[in-house]
Amino acid sequence: MLHVSMVGCGAIGQGVLELLKSDPDVCFDAVIVPEHAMDKAREAIAPFAPNARVTTHLSADAHTDLLVECAGHDALEEHVLPALEQGIDCLVVSVGALSQPGVAERLEAAARRGNAQVQLLSGAIGAIDALAAARVGGLDAVIYTGRKPPRAWKDTPAEQQFDLDALREPTVIFEGNAREAARLFPKNANVAATLSLAGLGLEHTHVKLLADPTVDENIHHVEARGAFGGFELTMRGKPLAANPKTSALTVFSVVRALGNRAHAVSI
């Protein structure tokens, strides 16, 4: 049985707990949240993981097999780095955090010191395996276009530049490289960062972001070209009802990763 501690109990964390509540190979031992959120977390996890303890941090003598981060960028510094130092493998959802200078290097260093591994999850996007494989032979271009309903861009710089509620046609709110996209839109940066880390890097991955009132889905389009040939991928992801900035596929990617760790056969 795989013993798991999870950082975060928001829309992603609760979705993961619900989908794995009947899996005999996965046991959630702890859910890690800020102190002010502990009571709410206890209530949220009760139907899915009633035996999991709610705590503010992973103890130094924790016997967990795996830490799963579902809490946002700050959780990498606060929880993932210490867990790696303790020798605990980690799964990371908030891949966009690695666009910040030095974060990727610190994660790798902590994992090496603890003889652990950190796995960056694909989240809302597919074909990461193909892109990473294509990089071995040489990539010429990786172009990502992200299209979301205007409401998904609330509380971002787009809200200062555009009247999102008044948009009547697809509108480009950003075009540039993945590093700049991640800096300006950190809560929407995970897909661009994941593609960059699998492919050409943050500086050389081209990103276009659109607010589109004609769609009610999060639409991701990836084009890659290189020595292998080329591919295009379009994904139309339904957002989580509890968080329109997040694709439901992100939850499913966590569930799949845990299953691959826990089950006898993985794919």
UniProtKB/Swiss-Prot annotation:
The keyword Oxidoreductase applies. The keyword Endoplasmic reticulum does not apply. The active site is at residue 220. Its EC number is 1.4.1.21. NAD(+) binds at residues 124, 190. Coiled coil: none annotated. It comes from the Bacteria. Pathway: Cofactor biosynthesis; NAD(+) biosynthesis; iminoaspartate from L-aspartate (dehydrogenase route): step 1/1. GO terms for biological process: NAD biosynthetic process. Keywords: NAD, NADP, Oxidoreductase, Pyridine nucleotide biosynthesis. It catalyses: L-aspartate + NADP(+) + H2O = oxaloacetate + NH4(+) + NADPH + H(+); L-aspartate + NAD(+) + H2O = oxaloacetate + NH4(+) + NADH + H(+). HAMAP family: NadX. The iminoaspartate product is unstable in aqueous solution and can decompose to oxaloacetate and ammonia. Specifically catalyzes the NAD or NADP-dependent dehydrogenation of L-aspartate to iminoaspartate. Belongs to the L-aspartate dehydrogenase family. This is L-aspartate dehydrogenase. The lineage of its organism: Bacteria, Pseudomonadati, Pseudomonadota, Betaproteobacteria, Burkholderiales.
